[in-house]
Amino acid sequence: MILDKLSIFGTDNIGIYIFTNDKYTIIPKIDDKEVIEKIQGILKTEIIQTTISKSVLVGILVTGNNDVILLPRTALADEIKVIKEQAKDVRVEVVDIRPTALGNIILSNTHGALIYQDLSEAEINKVKKALQIDTAIKGTIANIITVGSVAVITDKAGLVHIDATEEELKKLSELFKVKLDSGTVNFGSVFIRSGLVANRNGVLVGSSTTGAEILRIQRAFSD
């Protein structure tokens, strides 16, 4: 498992700009070739460069897993077209629910999903239908309702909010069928997704992430 530090647009909050699975990585248009090369070198996926809803905050607006990429209802037709044309090995679905920050409210891998508890049953069903996952439940992590903001889960492993209890870790591990650990990023931030991007090939962390945090992240995502 390869790990490296990264900054984007002068910030360590790299996860707000990046969505990745094991096949594709979606990022906004970035002029810095070294940044793009590092992302591709660590995550080892095809790179898709686009805005989402005219925003560079791809990681906040997009979610999914190795089978499907979920886009918010505000995604523009040309953005959807770009992703569908390039991400040919996964489904691309637009989810018509009230919230648009899908990356913050839906935490998913190919085995399960944890979803923002304030969604209506109709909205939950739309998310389940888009994901095509039977095991999708509403919940929180460490009493945080924006579950996608405080965890990163792959099909191999995951890291969640440092204050998640042992019972929470056990239940989440059973839901996602992977080993989990808790930790922080970017010198103490509990908002894991903002500072960590991971797939089965590698991990990127914000440049402020400390050595102790990196050791914990490496332990979480090690083979």
Swiss-Prot record:
* InterPro entries on file: eIF6 (IPR002769)
Keyword presence, Hydrolase: no
Give the UniProt keywords, A-Z.
Answer: Initiation factor, Protein biosynthesis
Reading the lineage from the top rank, the first entry is Archaea
Query: SUPFAM superfamilies under this entry?
Result: Pentein
What does UniProt give as the signal peptide span? none
Q: Which GO terms describe its molecular function?
A: ribosome binding; translation initiation factor activity
- GO terms (BP aspect): cytosolic ribosome assembly
Stated family:
Belongs to the eIF-6 family.
Q: Describe the task this protein carries out.
A: Binds to the 50S ribosomal subunit and prevents its association with the 30S ribosomal subunit to form the 70S initiation complex.
Q: What is this protein called?
A: Translation initiation factor 6
